[in-house]
Amino acid sequence: MLCWHHTFPEMNHNELVGWTEKNDSLVVLTFHTSFDYKRTLKRYEVCKPIFQKFSSGVIDITAKGESKLEQFLYLIHIGDWISCYIADLKGIDPVEVNVINHLKSEL
């Protein structure tokens, strides 16, 4: 299963140009904090309909906590649990790293 990340505003310059056809196997997860910059939020508001048009869905996850540290740790924690849950649904060992070990051995 392919997974990648990008950040605003950088994805508006590079990633977004590739969103040209519908991919029903793609789901967009967005992570937000109460500290998000207002221009970044505006960029997201403009991009969300594009994500919806070319993917099977968009899931917004907003951090809990009061400080930046609490919110960042919350998002890291929930992101890890999401990864483990999806791996379990697909019958994949979430800690197996054979391909990485192979790469390291070849280098």
Stretches found by the model and what they are:
Residues M1-L107:
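A SIS-like phosphosugar-recognition module
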